[in-house]
Structures are given as structure tokens and as C-alpha cells.
Amino acid sequence: MSHANSQNHNNEGDPACELDLRGVICPYNFVKTKLQLEAMESGELLAVILDDGEPIRNVPESIRNEGHIVVRQEAIGQAFRVLIRKK
């Protein structure tokens, strides 16, 4: 149980894929996220970078409605990084 050199001490694992959807408007950001999730295996993690405003309000909610798990959301500058676990 060593946490030396562990700046990110979560047990979520590394994302299998990351999508940078800054500048992509609704609903296209959700569609791109959904298509990427469909190409992934159950339990894999997807990181999505979204703009503030409509994207960060709508995409995580739509993802939850699809049955996936929003593990974490974190602000990165003017955007947000959302970590999603595929159902």
C-alpha cells in the first residue's frame, strides 16, 4: 500500500480513450461521446473534455440516461474533463 509518487491516488484506472470536444456544439458532442462509448468494451473508461455551459450541463446527464457512469468531473481551465465508465 505505497502511495509514494502517487499524485493521482484514485483507483479509477487510466482512460482507454480521451476525446477533446471543446468547440463542438450540442448535440454533436453527445453524439461523438456516444459513438466512442459504443466502440469500447464494458467497464472501460472514457475521458471527455467539454466546454462550460450547455455541454457540461447536457452531456453528463445524457450519458447517465444511457446507463453509463459519470465517475468524475473536474475543471481544467475554461473546460471540464469528464471521466465516464461504459456500462
Feature names for model-found ranges:
Residues 16, 43-47, 79-81:
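Intrinsic-disorder/low-complexity, polar/charged segments enriched in Ser/Thr/Lys/Arg/Asp/Glu/Gln
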Residues 2-32:
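N-terminal first-folded block
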Residues 21-73:
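Amphipathic, hydrophobic secondary-structure cores in small proteins
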Residues 81-87:
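Core SAM-dependent methyltransferase catalytic element
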